[in-house]
Amino acid sequence: MNRELGLWGEELAAQYLRKKGYKILERNFHTRYGELDLVCEKDDNIVFVEVKTRRSTRFGSPEEAVTPRKIGNLKKAAILYLKSTPRFFPEISFDVVSILVEDGKSKINHIINAF
């Protein structure tokens, strides 16, 4: 995947989530375990959102790129984020926003509490 497509997908996902009532707290939060694409707040809870954007399903759907190893790293990165903020969140969840771009159209699939 090229970086430009990924950044475009993250922006589209952020716009989509804002319309759904999410507040974007951080974008591209870097840790030694990898990057948290979007860190959001919804109903006083924190939501870590992994965004996957693809131009085709030839190698699987975008959400299939969220492997067990990736999930483990996202959870470790989330712990580091939580340690870095003084805020308390009663609930923590992980969502996936997959974006498939085909024939000039984008299809968004938002998986709430994906793992």
UniProtKB/Swiss-Prot annotation:
NCBIfam families: PRK12497.1-3, PRK12497.3-3, YraN family protein. This is UPF0102 protein Swol_1475. It comes from Syntrophomonas wolfei subsp. wolfei (strain DSM 2245B / Goettingen). One of its GO terms (molecular function) is nucleic acid binding. Pfam families: UPF0102 (PF02021). The lineage of its organism: Bacteria, Bacillati, Bacillota, Clostridia, Eubacteriales. Belongs to the UPF0102 family. Coiled coil: none annotated.
